Amino acid sequence: MPRVDVGEHSFQYMEEGESSPAILLLCSTGLDSKQWKGLLPHLGGRRVLCPHYLCYPGTDDWKGEGEIDSWMDYRASEALLLAEDGPVDIIGHSYGGFIGLRLAKEHPDRIRRMAFHEPIVWGCLQHTERDDLKNEF
């Protein structure tokens, strides 16, 4: 499988198909691209990318000190998104939905369509000072 480097870390990712626009598949916690194997035959040969997150098989373990930087998975996904020639479709589940929402917020011009199942949206509130939003969750 190909790799994308982010800082000191190297992330493995699944890449299949050729036709545009590409689809970025973002899996849930504990799963890798195998989560989407049942979906692949239905994507009509579209170019599909799916990063394997930090500490998952084929991807580096955390090399920093202290707690794992949870934004590393986001940065690997962002690198794949920005490497594409045009806007992509994103499909994300749970943790992958959170990453996808953040990508859409930061790079709306790079997203053509998006679909998320059970995104962990509370993570989107991590850096807000709006207590009213945090209190809802």
Give short role names for the model-derived ranges.
Residues 6-64, 86:
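Conserved HGGG/HGGXW glycine-rich cap/lid loop of the alpha/beta-hydrolase fold
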Residues 105-106, 110-137:
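Flexible "cap/lid" loop of the alpha/beta hydrolase fold
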Residues 38, 102-106:
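Active-site signature of alpha/beta-hydrolase-fold catalytic machinery across serine-
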Residues 72-88:
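Conserved acidic catalytic loop of the alpha/beta-hydrolase fold
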Residues 92, 96, 100:
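Gly/Ala-rich beta-loop-alpha elbow adjacent to hydrolase catalytic centers
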Residues 1-2:
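Short, hydrophobic/aromatic-rich segments at coil-to-beta transitions
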Residues 63-73:
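Catalytic nucleophile-loop/oxyanion-hole region of alpha/beta-hydrolase
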Residues 90-92, 117:
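Short beta-strand immediately N-terminal to the catalytic nucleophile in serine-hydrolase-like folds
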